[in-house]
């Protein structure tokens, strides 16, 4: 499986495709309409903040991906006070059809970051499936003031509400139970250079 973030600025849709070991395209997975950017910039993925993660469950039953940050209609990118509401997509790996979606909220920007007019980010950049409902998530943040920070979490979807029927989360975030998250490791504690 290969994923692409697309290019929201040029209205190039994200995609997920399955290829054989010799490079032949086997199938293109359906991307739900609400993820596709429109020409007004009012819905869909944000540029360079889409499907960076991709993982299969050990039994190869499900394929997971997630947006790196919120869809335009779901909320904002992270700030110093709040995280960004991402969507985790769970596909049936055999049929290639999306079968569930869950809310995942990133951590806020690192303390000390100055987001005013500067490059700052924090996003959900990778997932590793443990089973059908548990995953490892990796969040990577950057600011000129703090440099790169990376945190590893264990997440559970078991008590998270399914959100695939919700076109927008912006006004409903307080009503939706997100994936549960537990910090496993802040890589800053390892005292090694992060990039």
Regions found by a protein language model. Give the residues of each.
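Sequence/structural signature of beta-propeller domains
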Residues: 1-195
């Amino acid at each position: 499986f290969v994923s692409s973030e697309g290019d929201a600025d040029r209205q190039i849709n994200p995609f997920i495709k399955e290829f054989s070991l010799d490079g032949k395209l086997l199938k293109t997975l359906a991307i739900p309409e609400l993820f596709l950017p429109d020409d007004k910039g009012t819905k869909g993925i944000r540029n360079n903040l889409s499907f960076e993660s991709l993982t299969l469950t050990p039994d190869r039953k499900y394929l997971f991906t997630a947006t790196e940050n919120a869809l335009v209609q779901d909320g904002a990118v992270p700030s110093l006070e709040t995280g960004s509401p991402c969507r985790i997509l769970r596909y049936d790996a055999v049929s290639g059809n999306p079968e569930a979606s869950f809310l995942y909220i990133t951590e806020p920007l690192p303390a000390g970051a100055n987001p005013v007019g500067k490059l700052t980010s924090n996003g959900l950049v990778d997932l590793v499936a443990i089973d059908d409902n548990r995953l490892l998530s990796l969040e990577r943040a950057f600011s000129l003031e703090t440099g790169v920070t990376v945190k590893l979490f264990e997440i559970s979807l078991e008590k998270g509400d399914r959100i695939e029927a919700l076109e927008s989360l912006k006004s409903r975030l307080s009503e939706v139970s997100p994936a549960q998250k537990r910090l496993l490791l802040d890589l800053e504690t390892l005292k090694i250079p992060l990039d």
